């Protein structure tokens, strides 16, 4: 059976219509799948300065249409902003106990006891029993109240039964590192903050016991609407962070 001229013409147009329908459907699907929008991220100092930049760089390469606004403070500061929903997601050091928040660990951390390369104990192994005697006259430099690092360090010192007699409080990890390099005192900091200095040899660890482990956590309000961009950012952090470091 052969189509009439009118039928052949109609058939050609019908095929074009079907092809256009498939193209339009694919285009709409691509638009729906496109991840766009703006995220407001809160990060504690350690995470915001030493971990988050690499995550954002990798995420932006994959999702260039997502824009970011990042606020940085200590863990208590980020916790408060997550509670009042003024940020989409927070990244903090130390476990946050709050029934209003979803809390998920995304990276392991370790606290390292460090001194200047010129300190007599640089690179030494010291038993916990010897630690207080050897460091009793050395200022211990620590972060401010409300810092997740400070809380973790206080717990570590308690386990070591080490009570520094002279403590210097500084509100910046970088300031603490500079002070240790200048041989002002001793401190404990996250391993993620010390990669460059240890590689350069300007700061040396003191090995005194088993590693002090902690986690970095992702926090967000349970009742806050989660945009597609936010969902993809969280998924990216949980799936890709370990590969970036």
Which ranges hold each PLM region?
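Central regulatory/effector-binding core of bacterial HTH transcription factors
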Residues: 34-99
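Short amphipathic alpha-helical coupling segments at ligand-binding clamshell hinges
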Residues: 6-13, 51, 55, 127, ...
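A late-sequence structural motif
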Residues: 51, 204-245
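Flexible hinge/capping segments at coil-to-helix
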Residues: 101-111, 115-141, 228
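Alpha-helical "hinge/linker" immediately C-terminal to small N-terminal DNA-binding modules
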Residues: 2-33, 238-242
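Hydrophobic hinge/microswitch elements
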Residues: 74-79, 83-87, 92-93, 152-205
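Short beta-strand->loop
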Residues: 102-112, 191, 200-213
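Secondary-structure junction motif
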Residues: 121-125, 139-160, 227-234, 244-245
């Amino acid at each position: 059976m052969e189509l009439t001229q009118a039928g052949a013409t109609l058939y050609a147009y019908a095929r074009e219509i079907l092809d256009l329908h498939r193209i339009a459907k694919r285009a709409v699907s691509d638009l729906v799948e496109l991840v766009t929008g703006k995220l407001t991220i809160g990060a504690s100092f350690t995470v915001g300065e030493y971990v988050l930049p690499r995550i954002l760089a990798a995420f932006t390469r994959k999702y260039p249409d997502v824009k970011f606004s990042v606020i940085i403070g200590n863990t208590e500061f980020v916790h408060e902003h997550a509670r009042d929903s003024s940020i989409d997601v927070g990244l903090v050091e130390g476990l946050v106990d709050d029934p209003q928040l979803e809390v998920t660990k995304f990276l392991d951390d370790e606290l390292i006891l460090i001194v200047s390369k010129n300190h007599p104990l640089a690179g030494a192994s010291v038993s916990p029993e010897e630690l207080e005697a050897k460091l009793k006259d050395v200022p211990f430099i620590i972060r401010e109240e409300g810092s997740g690092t400070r809380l973790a360090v206080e717990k570590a010192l308690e386990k070591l039964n080490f009570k520094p007699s002279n403590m210097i409080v500084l509100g910046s990890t970088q300031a603490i590192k500079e002070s240790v390099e200048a041989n002002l005192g001793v401190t404990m900091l996250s391993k993620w903050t010390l990669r460059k200095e240890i590689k350069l040899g300007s700061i040396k660890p003191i090995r005194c016991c088993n590693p002090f482990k902690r986690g970095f956590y992702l926090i967000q309000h349970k009742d806050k609407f989660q945009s597609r961009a936010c969902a993809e950012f969280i998924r990216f952090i949980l799936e890709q962070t370990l590969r970036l470091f």
